Swiss-Prot record:
Listed name of the protein: MSDIN-like toxin proprotein 3
Maturation and modification: Processed by the macrocyclase-peptidase enzyme POPB to yield a toxic cyclic heptapeptide. POPB first removes 10 residues from the N-terminus. Conformational trapping of the remaining peptide forces the enzyme to release this intermediate rather than proceed to macrocyclization. The enzyme rebinds the remaining peptide in a different conformation and catalyzes macrocyclization of the N-terminal 8 residues.
Keywords: Toxin
Family of the protein in this entry: Belongs to the MSDIN fungal toxin family.
Superkingdom field: Eukaryota
Function recorded in the entry: Probable toxin that belongs to the MSDIN-like toxin family responsible for a large number of food poisoning cases and deaths.
UniProt cross-link Cyclopeptide (Ser-Pro), position: S11-P17
Molecular function terms from GO: toxin activity
Source organism: Amanita phalloides
Amino acid sequence: MSDINATRLPSFFFPIPCISDDIEMVLTRGER
């Protein structure tokens, strides 16, 4: 999932896959 999130999100905004995973989870929870 880290690679997928890194690809979906801007690499310059989320350079670290771990951070992108955390933000992805937050965005998913906010949308639902």
